[in-house]
Amino acid sequence: MEEYLITARSVTQAQRMAQLLERRGVRAVVGRVPMGLTGKGCGYVLRLRGREKAVAAWGLLREMGFSPAQVFQRWDDGYSEVEL
């Protein structure tokens, strides 16, 4: 299944976003940014399984006033930034 990563500005923001999504029925797991993904050193992401969940999460986060920075899709050979 496809995996999507939505970047967060801090661990606190990632945790808040995950909690709000959970309340809306969208499961997201908070994790560290994979090495070399953003070029900004350490960071946190929400991991979601499947494009449908990623699109739903992106819309809900924007609706709730969050401004997630980037979305990446995981491929066998790495990650690429995508638009939802």
Regions found by a protein language model. Name each.
Residues 2-5, 9-22, 26-56:
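Amphipathic, hydrophobic secondary-structure cores in small proteins
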Residues 50-84:
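C-terminal structural segments of small proteins and small subunits
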